[in-house]
């Protein structure tokens, strides 16, 4: 019953919330985002020079672009260009505890896009903007909508944007590698030395001082949820069941089937859409559906898995995938930052699939 930071595994939950609104007729996937968030109507596009070297959007950012990370938005932690730096300076890197999503989105929309909408795949705060759209479409704060339409119906009792005081003792600490240490060498002895190397991990965030202990008013649809493996397992089982669990219908069967199709232009993989410095998956042979990656070609992806498997992960090395062909869902939770520290996802996938013998 340990509670962990699921970070970007929040994105799939937020996308399901948006698709609930879609089924209710609130929007169409190719609607301009600016129709609902007018601040994005005049958001310029960076041309590659100084921050003010910009041009107008040639076509508008759409809701589909947000769900597929082809919106032109970015993350400040990429640290690859002046737009990333502007995100950090404006406090856009990760929604914090103060203010509201509406205020945060207005600050974001004042900064340039890194490319024309639809032109590139770039990991970004798109799901946070999508969370704000859920608020606009539903007329409810994102936390209230998630609780009423996903968390409560699925009995995800320990999932939310903060950990209740009664559960503070269940919140895990989060760790990171020490500078220069390799996870492969933790506890090993250096050649010619009888002394083990120093531990390869340090405390990244103690549970006693975690920001997730305090309530927030700024609900990050891209990375703000905490929860348990039981809770997220129920969410994945709902997806595997094509929208239903224990009599609770969250989405229609055809909606879930549509979400897990590759939505990138011309059925391209992520490698063909650009390769940013950060992703929760590899690029070759991997497309992107609505809210998660989708395996197009296992050989190109260099993974012993099924075409059609869909997945995502979180910054603290958490991961999930759903394989409709094999009728399995997998959830793995740990607390190790960043997710590139150790190739646990690749090893876990090999362990799971080698166990399928009939």
Set out the residue ranges of the language-model regions.
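Short, conserved catalytic-motif segment at the N-terminal edge
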Residues: 1-6, 26-28, 42-52, 342, ...
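Active-site SXXK
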Residues: 5-33, 37, 41, 127-135, ...
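Structural preference for long, well-ordered alpha-helical segments in enzyme cores
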Residues: 18, 146-149, 348
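Short, surface-exposed loop or secondary-structure junction motifs
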Residues: 43-304
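Short, surface-exposed beta-strand/loop micro-motifs that present aromatic residues
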Residues: 309, 316-325
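Short, well-ordered beta-strand elements
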Residues: 320-321, 327-336
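Generic C-terminus detector
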Residues: 335-358
């Amino acid at each position: 019953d340990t509670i962990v930071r699921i970070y970007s595994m929040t994105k799939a939950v937020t996308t399901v919330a948006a698709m609930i609104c879609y089924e209710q007729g609130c929007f169409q996937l190719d609607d301009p985002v600016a129709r609902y968030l007018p601040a994005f109507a005049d958001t310029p596009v960076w041309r590659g020079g100084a921050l003010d070297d910009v041009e107008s959007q040639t076509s508008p950012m759409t809701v589909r672009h947000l769900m597929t990370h082809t919106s032109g938005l970015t993350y400040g932690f990429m640290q690859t260009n002046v737009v990333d730096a502007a995100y950090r300076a404006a406090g856009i890197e990760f929604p914090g505890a103060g203010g509201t999503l509406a205020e945060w989105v207005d600050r974001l929309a004042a900064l340039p896009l890194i490319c024309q909408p639809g032109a590139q795949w770039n990991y970004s705060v798109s799901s946070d903007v999508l969370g704000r759209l859920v608020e606009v479409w539903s007329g409810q704060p994102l936390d209230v909508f998630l609780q009423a339409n996903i968390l409560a119906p699925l009995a995800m009792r320990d999932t939310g944007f903060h950990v209740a005081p009664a559960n503070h003792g269940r919140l895990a600490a989060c760790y990171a590698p020490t500078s220069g240490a390799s996870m492969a060498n933790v506890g090993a002895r250096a050649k010619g030395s009888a002394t083990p190397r120093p531990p390869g991990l340090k405390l990244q965030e103690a549970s006693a001082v975690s920001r997730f202990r305090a309530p927030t008013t700024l609900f990050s649809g891209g990375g703000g949820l905490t929860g348990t493996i039981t809770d997220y397992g129920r969410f994945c089982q709902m997806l595997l069941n094509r929208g239903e669990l224990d009599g609770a219908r969250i989405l229609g069967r055809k909606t879930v089937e549509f979400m897990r199709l590759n939505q990138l232009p011309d059925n391209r993989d992520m490698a063909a859409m650009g390769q940013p410095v950060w992703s929760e998956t590899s690029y070759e042979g991997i497309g992107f559906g609505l809210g998660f990656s989708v395996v197009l070609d296992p050989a190109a992806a260099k993974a012993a898995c099924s075409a059609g498997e869909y997945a995502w992960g979180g910054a603290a090395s958490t991961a999930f995938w759903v394989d409709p062909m094999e009728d399995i869902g997998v959830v793995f939770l740990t607390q190790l930052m960043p997710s590139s520290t150790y190739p646990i996802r690749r090893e876990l996938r090999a362990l799971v699939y080698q166990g399928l013998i009939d």
